[in-house]
């Protein structure tokens, strides 16, 4: 893992938030229940908007993460919440409270920065995607059941989700592109060094192969 993160953990490791995924998922379930049975406008009061932040509604820098990402149906929302719990708890076990807290909060920070700099209304899409990508990179061979029937390795879910993100990024306006990049801040911070090391190792292997063919 990254050297900067090791140093940060040695100094501030006690500030990791335990059971952070359970807190996140419990909040999303509560918001979903309120939206279904009490007040359908609850998401408006929690969502991340630059204009409303600048009016002093500062709670939105945190409250937006409790709005579950919607795929257009209640079933997709419920499945999304379950998947967040499944992936998030696995990452917590792998990384520990502190590193997982840094990962999640740096994603939140990137999303807030993207909203403030571009004015694009934020959602939890990139935050949820960042959890999936982290899980896919750490556990690429784990199998999940697509539609509860078809076994498929997590790495393929990750590739598919990454491709969708790339197409969304390419189709966005210039402010939208900046927002997409900033909203994935946690992925860049945690996995760019790993990707760089993997790329260097691949280049060295290819150079060694070419050299030994001669």
Question: Predicted regions span which residues?
Answer:
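A detector for small-residue-rich transmembrane helices and their helix-helix packing motifs
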Residues: 1-214
């Amino acid at each position: 893992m990254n050297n900067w993160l090791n140093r940060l953990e040695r100094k501030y490791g006690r500030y990791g938030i335990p059971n952070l995924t359970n807190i996140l998922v419990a909040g999303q379930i509560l918001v979903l229940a309120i939206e279904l049975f009490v007040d359908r406008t609850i998401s408006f009061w929690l969502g991340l908007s630059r204009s409303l932040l600048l009016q002093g509604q500062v709670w939105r820098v945190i409250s937006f993460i409790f709005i579950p990402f919607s795929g257009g149906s209640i079933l997709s929302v419920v499945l999304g919440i379950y998947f967040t719990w499944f992936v998030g708890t696995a990452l917590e076990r792998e990384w520990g409270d502190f590193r997982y807290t840094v990962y999640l909060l740096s994603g939140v920070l990137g999303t807030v920065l993207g909203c403030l700099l571009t004015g694009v209304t934020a959602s939890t899409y990139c935050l949820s995607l960042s959890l999936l990508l982290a899980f896919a990179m750490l556990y690429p061979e784990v199998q999940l059941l697509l539609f509860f029937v078809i076994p498929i390795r997590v790495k393929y879910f990750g590739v598919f989700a990454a491709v969708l993100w790339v197409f969304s990024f390419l189709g966005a306006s210039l402010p939208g592109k900046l927002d997409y990049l900033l909203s994935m801040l946690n992925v860049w911070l945690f996995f760019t060094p790993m990707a760089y090391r993997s790329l260097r190792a691949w280049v060295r292997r290819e150079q060694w192969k070419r050299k030994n063919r001669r």
